[in-house]
Amino acid sequence: MSKQTLVLLYGGRSAEREVSVLSAESVMRAVNYDKFLVKTYFITQMGQFIRTQQFSEKPSESERLMTNETIELTQKIKPSDIYEEGAVVFPVLHGPMGEDGSIQGFLEVLRMPYIGTNVMSSSIAMDKITTKRVLESIGIPQVAYTVYIDGQDLEACLVETLARLTFPIFVKPANMGSSVGISKAQTKVELRKAIQLALTYDSRVLIEQGVVAREIEVGLLGNDKVKSTLPGEVIKDVDFYDYQAKYVDNKITMAIPADVDQSIVTEMRSYAEVAFKALGGCGLSRCDFFLTQDGQVYLNELNTMPGFTQWSMYPLLWENMGLAYPDLIEELVTLAQEIFDQRESHLI
């Protein structure tokens, strides 16, 4: 039986490219090589596509994907050269130019099935401000927030924010993930600095009320029919869950499943599934919640391409549900082909 080609796109132009490499390396080791041939392409920070490695069997633990330090520029290709009839693409890309609809639109133009949400849901979910407004409109609880857009009156924004929110306040670039560019402010001076830092990553800034809460996450899988996992909890040894804590200092542990009341589990899974459908989701996502001491649930964000390393929450949540990492990848390929066929049928 011939193997299906799985194309891994990794790296990318965003500040989250290092996470992308870690996720892609985990995927390349977990794939069932009885069924798949894996071809990998690295996207540089400048947006160049580089043909890297090909795997017909499981690579050794010491094998690493090529990155900026090891790529051969002679292997630079036109982006459209990744096309292969019958192949499915796994864009293991995080952040802007990865999970914001850009690469999804490119793959749709190429007529290649791809894992993950479509152009619309990717672009909406990537923007924290737009996501909040959509979820508010369907009654899913959100923490209080204000918004600053580059070029607006910063002083007026500070006045509005301090009238509506109390310290601590969290400031986030609207279109970044993996906690990149996020700051916690305890004073007006810190708030101003936090907004200025966020503006180095994005022109749109979300300013949120800090809440004392547990961080609970739910995995989602499916197209028209979506399944959700039991929730898992992020347990922090730090003040807040930033990029350094997540990926450098290893100060994050997880409890799977999370120790929460059944009524809360039901509420979170329902909110997650409703949010996924409201944003037009397909394939996969991870819903991140805050759970306060008095039992209030807030949906913080919906991540359309969650971290995919072997120690990431999303694959571990599904493993807890009885779906092993290799089988999860296979299911995602099936869902990608299904949504591709559906999309193509509407264009005839």
Swiss-Prot record:
Its cofactor is Mg(2+); Mn(2+). Coiled coil: none annotated. One of its GO terms (biological process) is regulation of cell shape. It holds the Pfam family Dala_Dala_lig_N. Binds 2 magnesium or manganese ions per subunit. Its EC number is 6.3.2.4. Keywords: ATP-binding, Cell shape, Cell wall biogenesis/degradation, Cytoplasm, Ligase, Magnesium, Manganese, Metal-binding, Nucleotide-binding, Peptidoglycan synthesis. Pathway: Cell wall biogenesis; peptidoglycan biosynthesis. The keyword Protease does not apply. It comes from the Bacteria. Its main location: cytoplasm. It is an enzyme of class 6 (ligase). Cell wall formation. HAMAP family: Dala_Dala_lig. NCBIfam families: D_ala_D_alaTIGR, PRK01966.1-4, PRK01966.1-5. Belongs to the D-alanine--D-alanine ligase family. This is D-alanine--D-alanine ligase. The gene is ddl.
